[in-house]
């Protein structure tokens, strides 16, 4: 595994806003990465999601596309607490919300 995308959703805000069902939101996020057959690394919290490459040449682009599709969706930034891009090749972690700007 060379690359990972890590997402943390503010579940309390999702519940308090009462616009989206948290479980449906998490399933939507999962499906964004499943469409490219990317691996999900299970965590002990439903609002903490991690997706990784499977070592295929196309996975880098698929991870990036899925992450940016979420970033530019109309609801994601309102509820995202963390969005990290992990690069195990050069051992770096990028805070995407700070790099691109959290527009909420």
Please describe what each predicted stretch is.
Residues 31-52:
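Short, glycine- and small/hydrophobic-rich beta-strand elements in well-ordered beta-sheets
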Residues 3-7, 13-26, 30-32:
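Long, contiguous binding/interaction regions
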Residues 54-104:
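Long, continuous compositionally biased terminal/linker segments
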Residues 17, 21, 43, 55:
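Conserved aromatic-histidine-acidic binding/catalytic patches
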Residues 2-6, 50, 82-84:
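Ordered hydrophobic segments in well-structured contexts
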Residues 1-13, 97-104:
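Charged, low-complexity, helix/coiled-coil-prone segments
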Residues 7-11, 49-57:
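Short beta-strand-to-loop capping motifs
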């Amino acid at each position: 595994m060379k690359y990972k995308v890590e997402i943390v959703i503010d579940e309390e805000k999702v519940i308090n806003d009462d616009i989206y069902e948290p479980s449906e939101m998490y399933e939507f996020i999962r499906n964004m990465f499943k469409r490219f057959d990317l691996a999900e690394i299970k965590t002990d919290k439903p609002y903490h999601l991690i997706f990784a490459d499977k070592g295929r040449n196309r996975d880098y682009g698929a991870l990036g596309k899925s992450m940016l599709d979420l970033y530019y969706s109309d609801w994601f930034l309102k509820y995202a607490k963390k969005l990290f891009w992990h690069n195990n090749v050069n051992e770096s972690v990028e805070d995407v919300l700070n790099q691109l700007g959290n527009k909420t």
